[in-house]
Curated annotation (Swiss-Prot):
It comes from Yersinia pestis. Belongs to the thioester dehydratase family. FabZ subfamily. One of its GO terms (cellular component) is membrane. It is found in: Cytoplasm. Pfam families: FabA (PF07977). Keywords: Cytoplasm, Lipid A biosynthesis, Lipid biosynthesis, Lipid metabolism, Lyase. The gene is fabZ. The keyword Lipid biosynthesis applies. This is 3-hydroxyacyl-[acyl-carrier-protein] dehydratase FabZ. Signal peptide: none annotated. The keyword Cytoplasm applies. Its main location: cytoplasm. InterPro entries: FabA_FabZ (IPR013114), FabZ (IPR010084), HotDog_dom_sf (IPR029069).
Length: 181
């Protein structure tokens, strides 16, 4: 039995995800099957901006960014499984359960994220995810993403220069009044 391998290069990833530098954390999709699984790569470079402070002299890829990289992989799988979204729609990272970190990820590592579709219910899609370096598990988690609806156009608000004076703020115009009970 043969299976088709689907790969996605950075140009295709940029077409699917709204993330951009420095927050795009998926460099390539190695393979996927729509509605089932996706394997993606994050090449961890010492040039990542967060290594300046996490931690000086002992750079460690932040755990929350490992989770974000896996969440971005779930977003790609959702897009490839459900099709492109309507203008104004996004897939949002909606929740995480049972996140576990097994070992640090450091500059020079190539992190492989493997995400699998679990179920979809009431607009939420649940995925499991595993991140590995050199075949060794570095993180596991169960994640949810939600498909947003296009936002209604925002009302135009015009603030005239005479509405706010340096020593007076009109609460009914600039700051909504919050009544204490």
């Amino acid at each position: 039995m043969t299976t088709d391998t689907h790969t996605l290069h950075i140009e295709e990833i940029l077409d699917l995800l709204p993330h951009r530098f420095p927050f795009l954390l998926v460099d390539r999709v190695l393979d996927f099957e729509e509605g089932k699984f996706l394997r993606a790569v994050k090449n961890v470079s010492f040039n990542e901006p967060f290594f300046q402070g996490h931690f000086p002299g002992k750079p460690i890829f932040p755990g929350v960014l490992i989770l974000e990289a896996m969440a971005q992989a779930t977003g790609i799988l959702a897009f490839k499984s459900r099709g492109k979204l309507e203008p104004g729609e996004l897939y949002y990272f909606a929740g995480i359960d049972e996140a576990r970190f097994k070992r640090p990820v450091v500059p020079g590592d190539q992190m492989i994220m493997e995400v699998e579709f679990v179920k979809e219910r009431r607009g939420l899609t649940r995925f499991t995810g595993v991140a590995k370096v050199d075949g060794e598990i570095v993180c596991t988690a169960t994640m949810m993403c939600a498909r947003s609806k296009p936002a209604a156009p925002a009302e135009s608000v015009v603030v005239k220069p005479d509405v706010v004076k340096p020593d007076v703020v009109k609460p009914d115009v600039v700051n909504p009044v919050v009544k204490e009970s």
